[in-house]
Amino acid sequence: MALAFDEFGRPFIILREQDQKTRLRGIDAQKANIAAGKAVARILRSSLGPKGMDKMLQGPDGDITITNDGATILEQMDVDNQIAKLMVELSRSQDYEIGDGTTGVVVMAGALLEQAERQLDRGIHPIRIAEGYEMASRVAVEHLERIAQKFEFDVNNYEPLVQTCMTTLSSKIVNRCKRSLAEIAVKAVLAVADLERRDVNLDLIKVEGKVGGKLEDTELIYGILIDKDMSHPQMPKQIEDAHIAILTCPFEPPKPKTKHKVDIDTVEKFETLRKQEQQYFDEMVQKCKDVGATLVICQWGFDDEANHLLMHRNLPAVRWVGGVELELIAIATGGRIVPRFQELTPEKLGKAGVVREKSFGTTKERMLYIEHCANSKAVTVFIRGGNKMMIEETKRSIHDALCVARNLIRNKSIVYGGGAAEIACSLAVDAAADKYPGVEQYAIRAFAEALDSVPMALAENSGLQPIETLSAVKSQQIKENIPFYGIDCNDVGTNDMREQNVFETLIGKQQQILLATQVVKMILKIDDVISNSEY
């Protein structure tokens, strides 16, 4: 415990239990923080680009995840260090805001930290480095605006959207089907998009998966798919022109909410009670038929006797449907969710062209398709695959593609990928450094060098000579003054990203630079780390 004394000689505590805490100050704290950030970036660096490696992660309960999605890798890593946790948050915020570029943003932050360490070794103050980085990031973002290209698309001509989504999917495990998956993602987004307001609600796109079949069997359903079947095996498997009652109330006789009990001591009394319950449920079924319902979808269950009665009355039903699915069914069919049975009216019924039950494989697993709905602004992407891991990774890939398509609808500007945008920004930032007379000039040049880390990592992961490849592409960009030359990762034979159709969204690339700069500035400003000792 550290004690100090005031002017009257009275002791007071500055730092409680100091002997049980470890403390790093000044340059040591900054070096330790930078080392932690670089360690996280090093893990993800090999996952960048179309030839990036996958990581296998084992959870505490033995579940295995195989992925190269930056956000997922960091999410599932058991990180203790607080600076490493900041890098995890950085990746998560990129995923939340943009949906893509989660690996690139961490690699960029790691490179900025590495360059900052060199500047600290030269004796430059961390605040001056942070200010230099801020200036450089502004130059880079403005340059991206200048080299960005706008493109037009509509519901009938969406090829540019597909090409951009294919760039996103090319680094995933599903890249052999990237064309078909990109088309599915774009069609799904356009189906739910409000093109006038240029807004997309991704909650209206449900992504379902079922083990079996192959990746090529993945399909887009203009409607809702639920992992349920009809409550009775003898109910019809297909209903044309369905009128759907969507219930969140129990579809059974009500339970009395009192502490009273009924004593039944004779067979006649039991028979009377059973008949009363049956009559009550009979009336409920009749009410559904009277309002015109041809299918009941219920959030709760009902017993076998009720199920049998529904089958006899020719009223198909589905039970134990989740709340999120009910909401999507209501949106798709134009129906209203009925919380109290007495409120069921014909106006609250949803309408669907066809509701069908489909079996999969030899295990007779069934799912319910609700298609040709009154309101098509709710769709389902149904993924097939050889195993659960493949389906989970495909879901993550589809999520990235959906986010990219949404971002392009919001902002139609694109930049060229393959490291072309980073190289162009690096050259622009390097040229701008001469305009700043102060010490910040060194930090701005360091920022330009850090931008080169992304194309370097792309070249390295593709099995190319990173330094040779980068210098060749840089000189090509300077010589021809064209910012579209990048790293030829797929060995096509041309560095021109326009010919390779490698696009990225402008806002995704800008967000990467801004978020990485913010986190690095935050880390550089920490000069004192007090943590509990391990002993």
UniProtKB/Swiss-Prot annotation:
Keywords: ATP-binding, Chaperone, Cytoplasm, Nucleotide-binding
Keyword Chaperone (UniProt): yes
Gene Ontology terms: cellular component: chaperonin-containing T-complex; nucleus; plasmodesma
Protein's cellular compartments: Cytoplasm
One Pfam entry name: Cpn60_TCP1
Record-level Gene Ontology MF annotations: ATP binding; ATP hydrolysis activity; ATP-dependent protein folding chaperone; unfolded protein binding
Top-rank taxon: Eukaryota
Function: Molecular chaperone; assists the folding of proteins upon ATP hydrolysis. Known to play a role, in vitro, in the folding of actin and tubulin.
Family to which the UniProt record says this protein belongs: Belongs to the TCP-1 chaperonin family.
Subunit structure: Heterooligomeric complex of about 850 to 900 kDa that forms two stacked rings, 12 to 16 nm in diameter.
Protein name: T-complex protein 1 subunit epsilon
Annotated organism of origin: Arabidopsis thaliana (Mouse-ear cress)
Gene: CCT5
